[in-house]
Amino acid sequence: MAVPQSKTSRSRRDMRRAHDFLVTVNRSVCANCGAAKLPHHVCPECGFYKGREIVKKAVEA
């Protein structure tokens, strides 16, 4: 079986893990309703994308 030849130093271990951090999710504001949404995605609240209604939402009575 493979066995490490020498102990990995803290510096080398941390440099290897430098790119493993979590990336924060970028949010944008919907121009139609003002809700938070992902960029380049249809708004989950109102169904609009680039000023056009893509998904028809049922009107609550």
Swiss-Prot record:
> Which SUPFAM superfamilies does UniProt cross-reference here?
Zn-binding ribosomal proteins
Is Ribonucleoprotein found in the keyword set? yes
User: Could you state one GO cellular component term attached to this entry?
Assistant: large ribosomal subunit
TM helices/strands, residue ranges = none
GO molecular-function term, one example from the UniProt record = structural constituent of ribosome
Entry annotated with the keyword Ribosomal protein = yes
Name of the protein = Large ribosomal subunit protein bL32
